[in-house]
């Protein structure tokens, strides 16, 4: 079957080019803020302001977790946030203001300095960062991340999983990856499968990456 041929070809290419060694970086997970302006139909990460799972990590909490990460020999601090929550939630804006910042990206830049000073390398995954935000984070982060998920605009149509997720516009995500390449920032990315995509769309997304 054509699908099996594709899988076998991809596997062979990986083995030839990359080998079979799997490396990893021991990390601590920093759920900085899980409010998010997007609503993806499959998401279990996002919280609403009244949810019990809401996470708002202040500077001291970030510092304390970084110290614990160092104690347990973690190399990396994985910063994860929702997509620009301050654009949708007054609660996010008020919280950021209380911490002394006007945007999530600005706060992440500061938190990156905190964990680096504790001896842990920050890696930030915060959605569609601007080029200038990426340049600032580049000063402290060993790498950045943004999931392409899929480069098909069809998944943004009515009734599809990214209908209410403006940041998942493929052009915007690809632009982040392009900026990372131009700025020489190591980047993690990938596809999300099982959200209504076709095999052809998966293949095209890999080629786009």
Q: What does each of the following model-derived ranges do?
A:
Residues 1-23:
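An N-cap/entry alpha-helix motif that binds or orients negatively charged groups
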Residues 2, 28, 32, 107:
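Conserved acidic
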Residues 4-5, 32-36, 134-135:
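Short, solvent-exposed polar/charged micro-motifs at secondary-structure junctions
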Residues 11-13, 28-31, 133:
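Short secondary-structure capping/turn segments at boundaries of alpha-helices and beta-strands
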Residues 49-209:
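Conserved Radical SAM active-site core
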């Amino acid at each position: 079957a054509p699908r099996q041929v594709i899988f076998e070809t991809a596997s062979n290419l990986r083995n030839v080019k990359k080998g079979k060694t799997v490396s990893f970086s021991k990390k601590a997970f920093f759920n900085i803020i899980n409010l998010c302006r997007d609503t993806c139909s499959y998401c279990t990460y996002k919280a609403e302001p009244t949810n019990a799972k809401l996470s708002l990590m202040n500077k001291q909490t970030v510092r304390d977790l970084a110290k614990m990460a160092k104690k347990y020999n973690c190399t990396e601090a994985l910063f994860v946030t929702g997509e620009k929550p301050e654009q949708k939630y007054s609660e996010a804006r008020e919280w950021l203001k209380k911490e002394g910042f006007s945007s999530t990206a600005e706060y992440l830049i500061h938190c990156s300095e905190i964990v680096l000073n504790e001896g842990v390398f920050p890696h930030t995954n915060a959605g569609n960062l601007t080029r200038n935000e990426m340049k600032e984070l580049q000063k402290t982060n060993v790498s950045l991340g943004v999931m392409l998920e899929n480069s098909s605009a069809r998944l943004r149509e009515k009734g599809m999983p990214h209908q209410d997720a403006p940041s998942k516009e493929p052009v915007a995500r690809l632009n982040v990856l392009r900026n990372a390449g131009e700025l020489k920032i190591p980047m993690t990315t990938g596809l999300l499968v099982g959200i209504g995509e076709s095999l052809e769309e998966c293949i095209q997304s890999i080629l786009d990456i």
